C-alpha cells in the first residue's frame, strides 16, 4: 500500500475511527469555520469549504452543525478565531512528520506538540525542515469494486496525474488545482468515493519495525488525539507482518 494512505488504514483496523468520532466532528467544525472565513460561505464558490462540507457529510455530521460552523466563519454567528499553523519534526527512525494545527492559543499548542514528539522518541524541528519531502496533491480513494479501465480513462481525461492500483483500493492523484474538476468528473460518471481530499504525499518512505514502529504509531495516535491538531502526515512504512505483531 502506498505510504500516504497507510496511517488511515492502520487507524481504521485499530478501531480508532469510531472511538474518536467526537474529535473528528470537532476538527471538521474548525475546518469548515476557517474555510468559510477565508473564502466565503458558499461551498460552490469555495473549493476548500466544499471539501470540508463533503467530508462532514460523509461522517454523518448533522446539517445544523455544518450550517452553524459556516455562519461562525462568515461572522453571522459569534465564534472563536482560529490560527492555522504547521509544525514539522522527526519521529522515531528519522521519519518526517508534518502536523497541521488550528488553534486559538499558539503557545498552548506548540508546547503540547513538542511534548508529544519528545515522549515518543521524536523531536520537533524548525519550519521547513521536512516539508520539502512532501508534495501537496489531491487524493481520491475508491474501492476495487469499480471498473479500473473506465476509472483510469475518466480520471485522466479530467486532468488527473495518475491512477494507482494499490493493494486494497484504487487511488487517483491530481494537482490541487485540478482536484475539483477530477472529482466532479468522477461523480458525474457515477464513481463512489471512499474519500476525496487535498493531502500531503511523501516523496520517499522510511521503513520501520520493532520499537521504532511501535513508537511511531503512538506518536501518530497522540498527535491526532490533540484537539488543536487537524492533520498529521508522515513518511513511514510498516509491513503487514510487523503491523500484525503490534496490533
From Swiss-Prot:
Gene3D superfamilies xref list: 1.10.10.200, 3.30.70.980
Domain of life the protein comes from: Bacteria
Molecular function in Gene Ontology: DNA binding
Keyword Nucleotide-binding attached: no
Protein's GO biological process: regulation of DNA-templated transcription
GO cellular component, one term: cytosol
Cysteines paired by S-S bonds: none
SUPFAM superfamilies, A to Z: YebC-like
Subcellular location: Cytoplasm
Protein family according to the UniProt entry: Belongs to the TACO1 family.
HAMAP family: Transcrip_reg_TACO1
Protein name: Probable transcriptional regulatory protein GSU1074
Organism from which the protein derives: Geobacter sulfurreducens (strain ATCC 51573 / DSM 12127 / PCA)
Amino acid at each position: 500500500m502506498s505510504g500516504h494512505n497507510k496511517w488511515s488504514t492502520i487507524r481504521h483496523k485499530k478501531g480508532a475511527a469510531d472511538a474518536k468520532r467526537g474529535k473528528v466532528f470537532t476538527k471538521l467544525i474548525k475546518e469548515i469555520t476557517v474555510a468559510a472565513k477565508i473564502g466565503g460561505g458558499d461551498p460552490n464558490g469555495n473549493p476548500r469549504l466544499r471539501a470540508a462540507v463533503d467530508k462532514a457529510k460523509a461522517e454523518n455530521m448533522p446539517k445544523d452543525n455544518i450550517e452553524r460552523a459556516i455562519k461562525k466563519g462568515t461572522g453571522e454567528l459569534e465564534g472563536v478565531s482560529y490560527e492555522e499553523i504547521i509544525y514539522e519534526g522527526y519521529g522515531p527512525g528519522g521519519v518526517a512528520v508534518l502536523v497541521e494545527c488550528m488553534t486559538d492559543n499558539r503557545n498552548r499548542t506548540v508546547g503540547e506538540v513538542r511534548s508529544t514528539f519528545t515522549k515518543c522518541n521524536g523531536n520537533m524541528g524548525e519550519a521547513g525542515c521536512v516539508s520539502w519531502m512532501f508534495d501537496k496533491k489531491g487524493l481520491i480513494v475508491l474501492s476495487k469494486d469499480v471498473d479500473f479501465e473506465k476509472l483510469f480513462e475518466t480520471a485522466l481525461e479530467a486532468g488527473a496525474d495518475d491512477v494507482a492500483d494499490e493493494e486494497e483500493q484504487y487511488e487517483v492523484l491530481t494537482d490541487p488545482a485540478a482536484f475539483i474538476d477530477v472529482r466532479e468528473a468522477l461523480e458525474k460518471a457515477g464513481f463512489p468515493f471512499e474519500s476525496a481530499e487535498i493531502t500531503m504525499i511523501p516523496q520517499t518512505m522510511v521503513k520501520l519495525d520493532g520499537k521504532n514502529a511501535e513508537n511511531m504509531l503512538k506518536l501518530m495516535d497522540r498527535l491526532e488525539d490533540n484537539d488543536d491538531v487537524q492533520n498529521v502526515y508522515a513518511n513511514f512504512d510498516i509491513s503487514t507482518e510487523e503491523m500484525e505483531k503490534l496490533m
